Structures are given as structure tokens and as C-alpha cells.
């Protein structure tokens, strides 16, 4: 059994694409869990039956993207629910709102998670230091038993990792638990942007610009190197984003 969780924040733009990818590509039994935050009651009513478990949370411990609900808040709130449903051999997937599957999730993938213990997207361009190896939280897949071995706490609180990321406790948990996470590497044949619009191991697509300002660390580096305004780069990213969204909607 797969327990797959997502947090949708401020808009429901990606729900249909994501849920359809679950239905199309997950070839093993699964339960879907979602937390929605900072949207209208009409959206909540519309989307509540799209998942096996649906919850609304408007306030967490941390400010994030102009709202008072952070991904760690979502993890902390949903993991107790998932733990109630866990059985031996189950795996858990945490997937960003603007990420979805483009290939099948089969027993082979479940076995791979059991073998590798913890699988995550690896995106060096997300980091200031391109040599720093960090698991990006857009996609995590791990043994369900780890939620009873401290992983729930490690993913449920913000902590600096020394590289301006908030998943420091997860990095610490890896070391303490002797878990060497397995990376899904970027596999794009065409890169419209160094970070955005990523495909990983030909399995997962992550848009990156789904619910945030279209400026990343790589864009800030680019602005400095080219001596151009960030607003110029943001506008360029916005136009590419608009085109990609139009293509995804067809």
C-alpha cells in the first residue's frame, strides 16, 4: 500500500493534473491524503471528495509564501493520520502540489523504496552550492515504518541545514539513522529553465513555479552575472511558465 500526501496552498490549479496522474499511473493499492490551506470555502467544498482523506488547515507555526502555513506544518498534521493506516511493508510518498507522475508507479517502485529506504528528487540548481547534495521535498518516498522511528518529527519542524534550507532535521535524521537517501536525478531532454519545469528519472514532473514568485537562487545568480534586474528575469520566467501551463492543459 502507498500512502500519498500533498499540500495545496492558496490555489487548486494543479489538483486535476495531479489527481489524474495518481489514477493513471499508480498501479498498486494506494490512499491519497490532502491538506488545503488559504483558499475559499467554495474550493474546499469542490475538492473535498478528490482524496481518501481531506483536511483544511488555515494556520500553522510558520509564515510561508505570504501565508501562515508551511510544508512542515502539513507534515506534522498529516503524519498522525497516515500512521493510523500504516501496515507493515507500506510506503509513504510526499509530493508537492505542482508535481505529478508521468510514468507508472508499480510494485517495482515500492520494492525500490523498501530497498533504498528513502528516495527523493535531487536538484543541485536549487542550491547556492552546486556541490551540496540535498533531497528536495517536492518528492519524497520512504518506508512507512520510519514515521515511527523519528522521521515524523524530523519532517515536522523547520531547522536550518547550513545551506539556507529548512530541512536540517531531516539531514540530521539521515545521519543518526544511517540512511543514505537515493536520488532521482533530473532527466529533461530540454531545459526551458535551469530549475523550473523539471523531470526526474522520467517518473515525476515538478513545475516549481506552481505557487511561488518566479525567482529562484539560480535566477539571482544569473541577474548578478549578467548585471540585469531581477524583474526582467522574473518576467521572462513568467512568459515561459504561461506557455508551459498552456501546453499542460491540453
Report each predicted region and the residues it spans.
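Active-site-proximal specificity loops/subdomain of glycosyltransferases
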Residues: 35-88
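Short, acidic, metal-binding catalytic loop of nucleotide-sugar glycosyltransferases
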Residues: 20-30
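Short beta-strand-to-loop acidic/aromatic patch adjacent to the donor-nucleotide binding site
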Residues: 89-100
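C-terminal catalytic/acceptor-binding lobe
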Residues: 164-250
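Conserved catalytic core of nucleotide-sugar-dependent glycosyltransferases
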Residues: 100-172
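Short, aromatic/basic amphipathic alpha-helical patches
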Residues: 22, 42-51, 169-174
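Phosphate/oxyanion-binding active-site loops and adjacent basic polyanion-contact surfaces
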Residues: 11-15, 67-75, 162-163
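A conserved hydrophobic helix/loop-capping motif in glycosyltransferases and polysaccharide synthases
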Residues: 3-11
Amino acid at each position: 500500500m502507498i500512502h500519498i500526501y500533498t499540500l495545496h496552498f492558496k490555489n487548486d490549479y494543479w489538483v486535476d493534473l495531479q489527481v489524474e496522474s495518481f489514477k493513471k499511473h499508480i498501479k498498486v493499492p494506494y490512499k491519497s491524503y490532502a491538506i488545503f490551506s488559504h483558499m475559499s470555502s467554495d474550493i474546499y467544498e469542490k475538492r473535498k471528495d478528490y482524496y481518501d482523506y481531506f483536511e483544511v488547515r488555515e494556520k500553522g507555526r510558520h509564515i510561508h509564501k505570504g501565508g501562515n502555513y508551511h510544508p512542515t506544518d502539513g507534515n506534522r498534521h498529516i503524519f498522525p493520520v497516515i500512521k493510523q493506516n500504516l501496515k507493515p511493508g507500506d510506503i509513504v510518498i510526499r509530493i508537492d502540489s505542482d508535481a505529478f507522475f508521468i510514468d507508472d508507479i508499480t510494485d517495482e517502485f515500492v520494492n525500490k523504496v523498501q530497498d533504498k529506504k528513502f528516495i527523493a528528487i535531487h536538484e543541485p540548481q536549487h542550491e547556492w552550492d552546486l556541490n551540496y547534495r540535498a533531497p528536495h521535498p517536492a518528492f519524497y518516498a520512504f518506508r512507512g515504518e520510519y514515521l515511527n522511528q523519528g522521521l515524523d518529527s524530523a519532517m515536522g519542524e523547520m531547522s536550518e541545514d547550513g545551506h539556507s534550507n529548512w530541512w536540517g532535521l531531516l539531514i540530521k535524521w539521515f545521519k543518526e539513522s544511517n540512511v543514505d537517501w537515493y536520488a532521482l536525478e533530473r532527466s529533461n531532454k530540454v531545459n526551458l529553465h535551469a530549475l523550473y519545469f523539471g523531470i526526474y528519472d522520467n517518473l515525476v514532473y515538478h513545475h516549481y513555479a506552481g505557487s511561488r514568485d518566479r525567482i529562484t537562487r539560480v535566477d539571482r545568480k544569473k541577474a548578478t552575472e549578467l548585471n540585469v534586474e531581477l524583474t526582467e528575469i522574473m518576467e521572462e520566467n513568467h512568459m515561459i511558465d504561461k506557455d508551459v501551463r498552456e501546453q499542460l492543459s491540453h
